[in-house]
A protein has these predicted regions:
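Beta-strand-enriched, solvent-exposed domains that form extended recognition/catalytic surfaces
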Residues: 1-88
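Short linear motifs at secondary-structure transitions and domain/linker junctions
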Residues: 30-35, 85-90, 94-98, 140-144
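Short, solvent-exposed coil/turn linker segments
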Residues: 43-45, 95, 123-126
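Low-complexity, Pro/Ser/Thr- and charge-rich linker/hinge segments at domain boundaries
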Residues: 74-112
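Catalytic cores of extracellular degradative/oxidative enzymes
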Residues: 99-105, 109-207
Length: 207
């Protein structure tokens, strides 16, 4: 059931080309900041995806409604109408052992890790190479970094009060280096070993 007054949708996130010159062949790929959105209504929804990607559930409420602990929702996708890739949710899965199990079974190009404040959406194979068996040190570190930034911005109290629960979205572009925009953070996919494990992050000032 979709609670009255709430908005629920599916968003299909895939890739975009980033052109580095005037040539149509000189580009690299990176994850989109947003994707095609499919609004859901209570009952049966017949949807045809317009392209490939992973589906994210968007359950949007305003800050005041968050204080009332919005009711959970269930979305059922019939067998044969999608592929379960899996993702790691710190709140639900909790352990490095569960992370290792989930990422080893994943089949999609990208794998998602959701922390308290940070969400990694990185190349599956690069992530498997950089952090095959442990992720807690990485997600705790980046959750802390986002928390420090929000404290400096003066908005940490709103999260503590339960008025916001947005996540920072980190991707692994196939070009460029490191950057941040209004919508996401980029860590080039060849550098994930240096930013995923706490000891590697702390090993060099440039990480």
């Amino acid at each position: 059931n979709i609670p009255e007054g709430q908005k629920v949708s599916l968003q299909c996130i895939w890739e975009e080309n980033v052109y580095t010159s005037g040539s149509s062949t000189d580009y690299y790929k990176q994850t989109q900041a947003t994707g095609t959105t499919y609004s859901l209504e209570e009952g049966v929804n017949l949807l045809k995806m317009q392209g490939p990607g992973q589906l994210f559930v968007m359950y949007n409420v305003d800050g005041e409604q968050l204080l009332n602990n919005p009711a959970p929702i269930k979305i059922h996708i019939p067998l044969g109408h999608g592929v379960v890739n899996g993702f790691f949710d710190l709140e639900e899965h909790k352990t490095d052992a569960k992370y290792a199990e989930l990422i080893s079974k994943a089949t999609h190009k990208y794998f998602c890790v959701r922390g308290e404040r940070m969400m990694f959406y990185f190349h599956h194979l690069k992530m498997l190479d950089a952090a095959p068996t442990e992720i807690l040190s990485a997600i705790h570190l980046w959750d802390d970094i986002v928390g420090w930034e929000q404290s400096l911005m003066g908005i940490s109290q709103y999260r503590q009060d339960g008025k916001i629960n947005n996540h920072m979205f980190a991707i692994s572009p196939e070009g460029s280096y490191m950057w941040a925009s209004d919508y996401r953070m980029g860590f080039v996919y060849t550098y994930l070993k240096n930013i995923l494990l706490r000891e590697n992050v702390m090993a060099a000032e440039d990480n």
